[in-house]
Amino acid sequence: MKFFGLILVIILIPLFVLAGPPTNLTADNIVHDNLTGNIEASGEVTIIQAHLTLKTNKLIYNASTDSIIITGSFKIYDSIKNEITYATYGELSSDMQQGLLNSARIIQQKQKQQITAAKIKKDGDRYTVMDKAVSSYCKICKESSKPLWEIRSRKVIADNVKEKIVYEDAVFRLMGIPVLYTPYVSIPSSNVKRASGFLKPTYVFDDKNGLKVFTPYFLTLGNHADVRLTPWINSEGIKTVEARLRQELRFGNVTLNHASSVDKNSKYRWFFFLDQNISKMPYDFSANLKLKKVSDATYRSEYGFGTEDRLRNSFSTYRTKKKQHIEANFINYETLRTTESNSTMPSSIIDAEINQRLIPNHIGGTLDIKLDTRGNYRKASNNNSDGSSRDVVRMSGLATWQKDWIIGNGIVAGIASQVRSSSYRVYQDPSSKSTQDITPYGALELKWPVVNKKKGSSHLIEPIAQVVVTSNNKNSVPNEDSLLPEFDETNLFEFGRFPGVDAYEEGQRLNLALNYTYDRLGKFKAGFKFGKVLRTKDNQQFSSSTGLDGKSSDWLTSSQLNVGDNFGLINRALLQDDLSILRNEMHLDWSYNSLSTASKYIWHQSDATLGQNKSISQLYLDAGYNFDTDWNLSTSINYDFTENETTLSNGLDLVFYNDCTKASLSYTRKEISQTEKLNEIAFWLEFGGFGSKAESKLSYSRVCSS
């Protein structure tokens, strides 16, 4: 009989205990008072009410007040908020949306926030009011331990509708020491992605502008726009306002960056940058607009906004499909360099190009067609023969066909042909004339890859030979886009090594290379490449530093070595016949335990014909070391062997971070001009949950030891 009575109680509980959404109560023992309608549950007690789950050892349901009374420890899990509430006493409504909790603690698992309070009052789905509350995003392992920082408040009100938390009579404590009091402060809830408010402050000191304190204010303008304002004044009396506006549009987005300053001499200085992307245009085209303007040449570098010394204003439109690319650009350059003139450099450029790939049905292979036009305009109108006022309009076409096939013994044969055609109109330059030219190319290539695989390792050796023939076209055209030819493994088998259209590589030549690669289980990989160019005659198109001058080029070498994920080495060099180094570039990445490094070394021989009057010998080193789980030290060093000078280009950065706090102290040495350097010290401090998501901004979740 008792068994059937228990079944009846369990069946009737949802009918007269909890109103609203369906409720499920389970317990080891359940006692129902037929006179009062009260229910007492004990043992492992669980109530599930929609997204809320309550667990305790004992509770009483009061039928007259339609409430739940819990006299012992219990917890409530909210699956929507991903939040757990612990308390030692509670009086809750039957739907658990309203009530009073004593000695309570709330843990937001996703945002890692913890709030403890002497008393918590729940007022429906919207408000949760906490008296004598302590809040922190730091993980607290023991009840007696103190977090790195905390906020103690007389009252905390969590508004779940407006997604904000209000602190009344709040004291901010750092390592247990009170450092700040405010009678009222409202901050967004940690799950808010965007909200108006102050961002973390940054303190910067440099030997030119003194102490600067940055306190950005972020202002949302609806769901699709925002503004960030950063006013600051330094110890030298310079007043500055920085502003950034971002706007998402139906057809793209726009970003405006602006800063204006009044220096100690009452001089007004400013810069304005605009970047707009247009993603929805007719016929699937996209576009980009960039505008840059400054009040004077040194404002941005002196105030730490950047060292850009050429301003590029442009409008571009483009479309890319599987076998087609179309692009058109209007570009205007403004130089800030004292060694250049906006009148004599090509300040305005218009270019357009169409690239199309075709697959010929009868002959096979691939056919790439490129049509482009370009116009350069200079402001000068002196009509001199030195090209300082020269304006050029060019139209050109390029057709390239190539096909590969495998012949006997695994030899891969390839054939390619190319036709280039250009027409030039030259203005305001008596030394150059309008002209047209057509240049045909032909190439035959043979390569023989041989692979040997054995016991988890493989060897690949591949000799390559390519014969290229072309005419020697002596038409002289102004060279505007091919001033810096390069010779490396990426263009060894190209028809030419000039980057543009205005110059092309002449004559017959033989390109040779030998590739070797060793791979063992992907954990150890080594390889090298040797290459050389042999010509029938020296056409005197290249300077000595390119490695391409003479009938026989210098030796092109490229090597790489990878050991697991911790060591990587790449080296590229041009060697003369006597093995002296003409150019060398080495990249080395290495990591071991807590240490990681990335370095690059560059050596270029001087070449006055290319405007390089001194040899370049520079070492770049980036290194970082994790002392433990909380501290990291990183540095970036650039050493110029030619000038015998060391600079800290990115400086020295010491960072402390844990589950709730991140702080950075950095030293930077910047080059703001060819003769002046700026030393800068910066400090900023960030607390998890204030203006950012704690789980994304900070480093890790601390695990308590048992």
Q: What is the meaning of each model-derived region?
A:
Residues E83, Y89-N102, I106-Y137, S144-I151, ...:
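Outer-membrane beta-barrel proteins and related beta-barrel translocases across Gram-negative bacteria
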Residues F16-V17, T470:
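Hydrophobic alpha-helical elements and their junctions with loops/disorder across both membrane
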Residues G5-L15:
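Bacterial N-terminal signal peptides
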Residues V9-I10, N38, S67, K155, ...:
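A generic structural signal for solvent-exposed, polar alpha-helical segments
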Residues G20-K142:
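Charged (often Lys/Glu-rich) extended helix/loop segments that serve as interaction or gating elements
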